[in-house]
Amino acid sequence: MKSCIYPGSFDPFTLGHLDVIERSANIFDKVIVSVGENASKKYTFSLEDRLNSIKNNVKHIPKVSVVSFSGLLADFAYESGCKVVIKGVRNFQDFDYERLLHDIGLTQQRGIETLTIFSKSELSHVSSTAAKEICKNGGLLENYVPLSVKQELETTLNGQLILGVTGEIGMGKSYFSEKFCYVESIYGFDIKHIDLDKLAHDILHNRTERVYIDLRHSILKEFGLSIGNESIIDKKKLGQIVFNDRPSLKKLNDMMRIPIMTRIRKEIGNFKGCILLNGALLVEAGFLPICNNNIVVVKSSKEKQFYNLTQRGYSVEQIENRINSQLNTDTKIKLIEESINKYGHGKLFEFTNYVGEEEFDQIDKIKRWIDCYLY
């Protein structure tokens, strides 16, 4: 049986590491991912956390085992019966460094050879150090680490856990969010509610930065001058256009994606605690990874949904157009479940509004889940 060792500190485990493991498994019958432990080195994650993180993200590869080691790699490889050590190489600096380590290994006379696997071009910038720095500054991590690791970084380095709140329009997402924040505050927990509708309103009405003025100009150019000017976009007039035409709604979502994500990062800032990200279009806009696939889908009766929307001043026709322009509850749930399966990480909660004391039981279930990660 051909076997190899892939050593590293994996602090944290990245998509680059995962790629090297998957490619090694195509060559060897057995891949031993070996997590090094050096008493003189300071790690972000404990040895146990690193082992569990890797095991969770390689469980789809049957040829892989995950173990820890200390001391000389050459000795560990020798006692493991492996003649080949795999090293991932991203650039010339990596190559020179790994060549030096290989030469040092040869002096230990264990007959161990080094096989270098060059990173894919789209992963050549990925490193554990870069992932940690990006996390500390609130940047996008989806292309650096698996979602489970992204969540581990956010909770460990930033003290943050992001929970998405979504559902059809008029189902009571804000009602749930406000009630949840109230319950959490009673227990003395820190929680922040970010309403994506309010962020969008701020971008379309108030932001004076040049990039947002240019965005409003682009929206006017796309949807017509009748919806406002470069200073203010009339959301109702814009809504009459996009909620009657799904391609137009998708176009608007695409235009707003980066501005919204930028404002989300600004809103989150250095806040420590649970962050509720409330938006009807979390699924449609591709925001599930921001929440690490941790989502509360808010549900209610159709009668209550219509009542809530009529209270906002919408006509029956406007209500039907808005409902029909968005994914229904069952479809949202299906797509969230598919995303959880795809990324191997996430948690789906279903919350039914306006059911009296049962609401507190549902909230308590979500609260206990949050406590496992933050408190």
Predicted regions mapped to residue ranges:
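ATP-dependent small-molecule kinase phosphotransfer cores
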Residues: 198-272
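Nucleotidyltransferase catalytic core that binds NTPs
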Residues: 1-160, 300
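Well-ordered beta-strand positions
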Residues: 30, 84, 133, 192, ...
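NTP-dependent small-molecule kinase module
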Residues: 156-163, 169, 175-179, 266-274, ...
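A conserved segment at the C-terminal end of the G1
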Residues: 174-190
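ATP-dependent NMP and nucleoside kinases share a basic, alpha-helical "lid"
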Residues: 27, 77, 98-113, 258-270, ...
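Short gly/ser/thr-rich secondary-structure transition/capping motifs
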Residues: 14, 66-68, 275-280, 325
